[in-house]
Amino acid sequence: MKILLAIALMLSTVMWVSTQQPQAVHTYCGRHLARTLADLCWEAGVDKRSGAQFASYGSAWLMPYSEGRGKRGIVDECCLRPCSVDVLLSYC
């Protein structure tokens, strides 16, 4: 029983430490930004749809979300300031 408790404690500690490590942030601008985003989206298997494809579904509630992330763009988030891969993936 003590060994199971020790293993559980060790696993929970390892999991906690791995979640506490900060994700690397970099500045991406110009071609580097475009290539990195294209590579990440391709690896993630994201098939970005155009606004016309959303309109073909005819769902009025989808239209406000087809504009993307609003006023802040990828350049604001990843070129003017460093950003993580998670932020880049959110633009796929």
Curated annotation (Swiss-Prot):
Q: Which residue positions does Pyrrolidone carboxylic acid occur at?
A: Q20
**Keyword annotations:** Cleavage on pair of basic residues, Disulfide bond, Hormone, Pyrrolidone carboxylic acid, Secreted, Signal
Query: Per its record, what are the GO molecular function terms?
Result: growth factor activity; hormone activity
Superkingdom assignment = Eukaryota
Name the GO cellular-component terms. Answer: extracellular space
Q: Name one Pfam family in it.
A: Insulin
Q: Which cysteines are joined by disulfide bonds?
A: C29-C79, C41-C92, C78-C83
Q: Signal peptide span per the entry?
A: 1-19
Residue ranges annotated as propeptide in the record: 50-70
Question: Quick one: where is this thing mainly located?
Answer: secreted
Where in the cell? Secreted
Recorded hits in InterPro entries, A to Z, give: Bombyxin (IPR017097), Bombyxin_A (IPR030680), Insulin-like (IPR016179), Insulin-like_sf (IPR036438), Insulin_CS (IPR022353), Insulin_family (IPR022352)
The family classification in the record reads: Belongs to the insulin family.
Miscellaneous comment text of the record: Silk worm has two kinds of PTTH: 4K-PTTH and 22K-PTTH; there are many forms of 4K-PTTH.
Q: How does it assemble?
A: Heterodimer of a B chain and an A chain linked by two disulfide bonds.
What this protein is reported to do is described as: Brain peptide responsible for activation of prothoracic glands to produce ecdysone in insects.
What's the protein name?
Answer: Bombyxin A-6
Q: Which organism is it from?
A: Bombyx mori
Name the gene behind this protein.
Answer: BBXA6
